[in-house]
Amino acid sequence: RPDTETWLEKVIQYYRNETGLKVADLGTGSGAILVGFLYYCRDAVGVGVDISTEALKIAEENGQNLKITDRVEWRQGDYLKAFDEEDIFDGIFSNPPYIPTKDIGGLPGEVKHEPRLALDGGTDGIYFYHLLAKGAAEHLKPGGFLAVEFGIGQATDILEMFRKSAQYEDFEVIKDYGGIERALYCRKK
C-alpha cells in the first residue's frame, strides 16, 4: 500500500548499502515489507513472523516471486513470543493491527475484506505498540532500528510511549504521500 511505501522506502535508503543485516518483520501478513526490504538490500537476511499460517503461505509466494527465499525464514508465531533469546536483529519492522475494536464495523469495503486479526488493535488501537515498546529492544542490537506503521492520529501517543520506555533514541515520524504521519522510526540506545 502507498501508506507503507513511503516509510519503507526511507528505511531502505538508510540501509541499502549495509552488509550482513539481519531484520525481522512482526505481523508480516503478505510479507510485503520484509520482501521489499530484502529485495533492495541484497545482502540482508530476514525473519517474517505471523500468527496466521495462511498469511505466511502468501508471504512465502511473494518471496519466491522476488527470488529472496534463500535469505528469509517464515515463522508461525504470536508476535514477539515467536522469538527466542538468541534472536537478535539489526532492525525490526511492524505494521501491526491499529484500528480500535469499536471502529472495525465502519471500515471502507477495500479494508473490510482483510481478516479481523489483521485489523483489530484492541480497545484503543495501540495494543501491539505497548508490546513493542516493552519487548522489542531485547531483540535488537545496540543501535538497531525499529520501524512501525500506525493509524491516522496515533503518532503522538505512540511516539510518547516509545520515548517513555527509555530504550530508544533518534526518533523520526515519517509522513505518507498525503502528508499524514504514518510511521515511527527509532533506534535502540
Where do the language-model regions lie?
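Conserved Class I SAM-dependent methyltransferase catalytic core
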Residues: 123-187
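Mobile active-site "lid"/loop adjacent to the S-adenosyl-L-methionine
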Residues: 98-128
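S-adenosylmethionine
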Residues: 89-90, 109, 167
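Short, well-ordered coil/turn elements that cap or connect secondary structure elements
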Residues: 18, 41, 67-69, 114, ...
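Acidic-residue sensor for enzyme active/binding pockets
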Residues: 5, 110, 114, 149
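C-terminal beta-strand of the catalytic ATP-binding
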Residues: 98, 187-189
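Conserved SAM/SAH cofactor-binding pocket of Class I
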Residues: 3-104
